[in-house]
């Protein structure tokens, strides 16, 4: 009985019930309580309930509920970055403002759209994405003006804002996905230029930024990135090395029309799967 009680206490302590504050964000006095309830209920109703936060998510999840905290978050692949973005989006939407998610890859945009639609459609929010050719159609402009949650590639968004910078005036949260893809290649430079434009807008102070990444530099480079995203406001990045699964190294050996995968299980020697 004691063990069961301790397990339940631990589960509750790290659940969304405890992590999501009861008090609404600024502007969310009328809607937040109901949206909070629907958000938790939607995740609970999934085939495998998703109410407990993993160790990798806990610090970032708590900070993501503070709409004034610009975040830089580095979590390993499959360690729960999307849930951090969803919590930040919930707080923004409850306050009556829209959400923009920038994803550097088209395939990632489509995947992110599906994930956010699954989470936020039951709450009554619209979700759409913009990717493909850099041109802007009337339909694309309508998406940017009207959808509650927009997922866009840097190229598409940059083109849209050069045509009409007011398209994101009522955006309250910008999520920069795969933040480590800001670098020296042509596509990475485009991403960096877009981020710089967003940070230098006259209304940048009214818009929260959350940067998510699986890989971030150490030392001074990380400090510089955090200071850049936070516009030099003091604050630490969130980092975790915890993963929900174990990693194993292996060798794939191709043999004609079949393959053999050899895992190296530390002292156990090769393993044939």
Locate the predicted segments by residue:
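Helicase-associated low-complexity/disordered flanking segments
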Residues: 1-63, 67-71, 125, 245-248
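Walker A/P-loop
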Residues: 67-88, 185
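Pre-Walker A (Motif I) flank of P-loop NTPase domains
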Residues: 67-73, 97-99, 147-148, 207-208
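Conserved Walker A/P-loop ATP-binding site and its immediately adjacent core
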Residues: 79-84, 91, 97-118, 156-159, ...
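Conserved helix-turn-beta segment of the N-terminal RecA-like "Helicase ATP-binding" lobe
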Residues: 108-131, 225-233
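Conserved motor-coupling elements within RecA-like helicase/translocase cores
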Residues: 133-151
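SF2 helicase catalytic motif II
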Residues: 150, 154-158, 164-208
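Conserved interdomain linker/interface between the two RecA-like ATPase lobes of SF2 helicase motors
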Residues: 196, 208-273
């Amino acid at each position: 009985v004691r063990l069961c009680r301790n397990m339940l206490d631990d589960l509750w302590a790290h659940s969304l019930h405890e992590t999501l504050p009861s008090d609404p964000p600024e502007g969310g006095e009328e809607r937040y309580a109901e949206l909070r309830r629907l958000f938790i209920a939607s995740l609970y109703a999934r085939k495998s309930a998703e109410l407990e936060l993993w160790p990798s998510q806990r610090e970032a999840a708590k900070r993501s509920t503070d709409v004034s905290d610009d975040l830089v978050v580095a979590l390993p692949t499959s360690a729960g970055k999307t849930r951090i973005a969803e919590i930040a989006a919930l707080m923004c939407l409850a306050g009556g403002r829209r959400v923009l998610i920038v994803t550097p890859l088209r395939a990632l945009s489509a995947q992110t759209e599906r994930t956010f639609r699954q989470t936020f459609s039951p709450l009554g929010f619209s979700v759409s994405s913009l990717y493909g050719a850099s041109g802007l159609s009337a339909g694309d402009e309508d998406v940017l003006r009207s959808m509650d949650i927009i997922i866009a590639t840097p190229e598409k968004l940059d083109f849209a804002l050069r045509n009409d910078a007011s398209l994101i005036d009522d955006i309250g949260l910008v999520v920069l996905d795969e933040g480590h893809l800001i670098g020296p290649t042509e596509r990475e430079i485009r991403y960096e230029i877009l981020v710089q434009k967003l940070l230098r807008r006259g209304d940048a102070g009214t818009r929260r930024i959350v940067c998510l990444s699986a890989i971030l530099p150490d030392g001074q480079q990380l400090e510089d990135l955090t200071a850049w995203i936070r516009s030099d406001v003091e604050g630490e990045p969130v980092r975790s090395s915890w993963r929900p699964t174990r990693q194993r190294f292996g060798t794939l050996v191709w043999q004609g029309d079949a393959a053999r995968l050899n895992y190296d299980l530390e002292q156990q020697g090769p393993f044939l799967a």
